[in-house]
Amino acid sequence: MAQSRLFFSADKAEAERTYNILEQAFEDDGFPIAITEIDEDRQIFEVSVYVEDDAEEVAARVDALVGPGLFDTEELPDIDWVTHSLEGLKPVRAGHFFVHGSHDRDKIEPGDIAIEIDAGLAFGTGHHGTTAGCLELIEETVQTEHPTNALDLGTGSAVLAIAIARLAPIPILATDIDPIAVTVAAENAAKNGVAEHIVTATAEGFGHPIFRSYSPFDLIVANILANPLIELAPSIKEHLAPGGSIILSGILDSQHDAVLAAYQTQGLTHQKTLHREGWVAIHLK
């Protein structure tokens, strides 16, 4: 199958801005999108989009989003670029969490809460600003509020569910609409030694009967996108235990106020917002 890479290099701020635009635009297409540092001295980063067969069509969409002629295109050998696209990313620290691939186990330091997530078919490796913000809020919330159960809605790679389990041995339900993500989530939970605490399920919204067995939740985390978060606000509030906390992300800076208003309308109180690389993570109670 023909594979191509669309790529563009710029300074850190411009590369991150472009990466965020493309990731938001191509969320439903499933194209792997990566940002990697290619010149540490000059702080130059490269944004790559990996596509199969339809490179010209995707290139036209990219031009419409970020301006014509910025991205170059190259043909690639037939290898697993879904995995390869993120191999160059460095480990990420978020609070005491250290999210890393298997090739960076030697970089774990004393005191780290290590989470091993290799790049693959499920979104959410911890290398993304929106995930990092969630991890920081999870650490603070779990350690201060001591929830007795939790929900990771739209779990992706299960990095957030794993983070909760590493802090507290409580029942955690991790759901996603994508069955591939659910399979990957279960594998990652096992790899990180917390499978006994995490139950995974393929579910869209809250329609799955499994929620009747676990709800209400002391802690709900949802790192998805702004529009689904707004639509799900009543259901998320309905499944939150009295006094419980919600941590939301997948939200651009410009979308913060609209998402916050949707949850304040449900009677929730804003606790804190973290800003990371153009994205926000919101804590409400």
From Swiss-Prot:
Record-annotated residues binding S-adenosyl-L-methionine? 131, 154, 176, 223
| Gene Ontology molecular-function annotations | protein-lysine N-methyltransferase activity
Q: Which GO terms describe its biological process?
A: methylation
Q: Could you name the Gene Ontology cellular component terms for this entry?
A: cytoplasm
Which superkingdom, per the lineage? Bacteria
Write out the function statement from the record.
Answer: Methylates ribosomal protein L11.
Q: What is this protein called?
A: Ribosomal protein L11 methyltransferase
Q: Which organism is this entry from? A: Brucella suis (strain ATCC 23445 / NCTC 10510)
Lineage, highest ranks first: Bacteria, Pseudomonadati, Pseudomonadota, Alphaproteobacteria, Hyphomicrobiales
